[in-house]
Structures are given as C-alpha cells and as structure tokens.
Regions:
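Interdomain hinge/linker at the junction between the two RecA-like core domains of SF2 helicases
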Residues: 30-33, 37-38, 45-93
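C-terminal helicase lobe
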Residues: 95-113, 122-152, 157, 163-244
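Short, conserved loop/helix-junction motifs that constitute active-site signature segments
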Residues: 1-2, 31-35, 92, 188, ...
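SF2 helicase catalytic motif II
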Residues: 1-38
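Structural recognition of the conserved hydrophobic beta-strand(s) that form the central parallel beta-sheet
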Residues: 4-7, 38-44, 152-155
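A short acidic, helix-capping loop that chelates divalent metal ions and anchors anionic groups
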Residues: 12-17, 71-75, 135-136, 209-213
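Catalytic P-loop NTPase motifs of RecA-like helicase/translocase cores
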Residues: 11-21, 48-49, 162, 180, ...
Length: 244
C-alpha cells in the first residue's frame, strides 16, 4: 500500500481545466484508488487563488508558505526600448549563460538565427529550444548548456519546469509572459547557485496586445465553459439577474 504521495509543480493541479493538463483533474480518483495516502503538494509559483483551488482538488488541510526572497536577483526594466534587439545582442555578447524566452516556437528559431548573425563570435554557442524538438534533442541542448558548450538558449516556456541549471546569469523576457505563474517560472531559472544574476524585461506594450489577441483566439466558448462546470448555465445566472 502506498502511504505517501508527493505532487511536484502542483500549481498545475490548481490550474487544470478540460483540455489543458486535464489529467490533473483525475488526481482525486487516483488518490482514492491508492487508499487515500498522505499528500504533499509542492510548488514555487502558486498564487493565492491557485492554492485555494489545490486545497479544493486535493486532500490538503494545511499550507506552508516560504517567504524567501532571492536577493541575488536583479530586475532590469528595459521595456519599450527603441531597439530591444540591440540590447539583446549586448547581453548575449557577454558570453555569460543566458536564456531568452519568446512566445512561439517559430520565434525561438528565428531569433536564434538572428543572434548567430549579429553575434558571430558566439554563433556556435547559441541554440533554440522548444517543445517541438524531440526529447533526445532537447536533452542534448540541456547538456550542452550545462557543460558550457552553449552559452545562450532561445526558448519557449518549455525550458522551465524540471530544468535545474545553477549558473544562468541572464534571463531575458523578450516577449511578455502569459501570467504571473509563467513569469515566476521563467525568472526563477536565473541565479540558482546564489550568485548575482539579472532578469531583463525586454517586452513591449505591443506584446501585451499580441497576448490579448492570442488569448481571445484560444479562449473556449461559453458553452464549453458550461460543460466544464466553470460557469453556471444561463438559467442559474437568471436567478441572480432576472434580466437575463
């Protein structure tokens, strides 16, 4: 009999919806099938609403919040620069380990190619990384970055959870993250060895508009939300607002 279960990156269980990591929605049934073991859920990025949802979905009766502040991290705000690409080139040219986050696989490839041209001395040390790569290829990129063969990775959010490299000196948010949890996951890659590291904000107000359009495109229809029990049907709203 299994008596103790640990769920890492547990914020996903608090964010899970139909079609998006929906396997987490099966956790209550899985735990029941295991005989209701003691559960420890861990995460570094859960917001207060996510913690509340975790307590609802999982058999959690108490929470512990570590208020540790990583004082080795510096935040450099370069949003809305006239040329963020030039600023990015100057960061990559230092040769220090750098992760640049973008919002699409195509952008990861395109920006890596651009940087190889703009920073020729580092061209062979720049790679892209995204979930479209085979697992074996992603592993090779990770190992090359770990041993110093690569100094710069242009990546989607795929380079995040489960990747623990201690000596990343620069994390660049070239495009705007989609939320606080994603921001924390990306920023949290920097300076895990306790040494000074910099988080560079290079996104612009234009990125906010792009994100809004993307969210509008991918947002489920109201009928779908009703089937997922995320919003009540119109009949239920009518009890609150008789004009519906």
């Amino acid at each position: 009999r299994i008596g103790f279960v640990v769920i890492d990156e547990a914020h996903h269980a608090g964010l899970a919806k139909g079609g998006d990591r929906s396997a987490y929605l099966d956790m209550p049934d899985i735990l029941k099938a295991l005989g209701d073991p003691v559960v420890l859920a861990t995460t570094a990025t859960a917001t207060a609403p996510v913690v509340a949802e975790l307590a609802r979905v999982l058999p959690i009766t108490s929470t512990v919040v570590d208020e540790t502040v990583r004082e080795n991290l510096q935040l450099e705000d370069d949003r809305d620069l006239a040329s963020r690409e030039n600023r990015l080139v100057s960061i990559v040219a230092t040769g220090e380990k750098t992760v640049i986050y973008v919002n699409s696989r195509d952008q990861s490839v395109a920006l890596a190619k651009t940087l190889r041209k703009r920073v020729p001395d580092c061209a062979t040390h720049i790679a892209f990384y995204n979930a479209g790569l085979a697992r074996s290829d992603r592993r090779r990129v990770e190992e090359a970055f770990r041993d110093g063969s690569l100094s710069c990775i242009v990546s989607t959010s795929a380079f995040g959870e489960g990747v623990n490299l201690p000596d990343i000196r620069h994390v660049v948010l070239y495009h705007m993250p989609f939320g606080a949890i994603e921001f924390n996951q990306m920023s949290g890659r920097a300076g895990r060895d306790g040494q000074p590291a910099v988080i560079h904000l290079l996104y612009s107000s234009r990125d906010a508009r792009i994100n809004e359009r993307l969210l509008d495109c991918y947002a489920p229809e109201r009928d779908e939300l009703v089937t997922l029990n995320i919003v009540p049907p119109v009949s239920e709203w009518s009890k609150i607002n008789p004009n519906l």
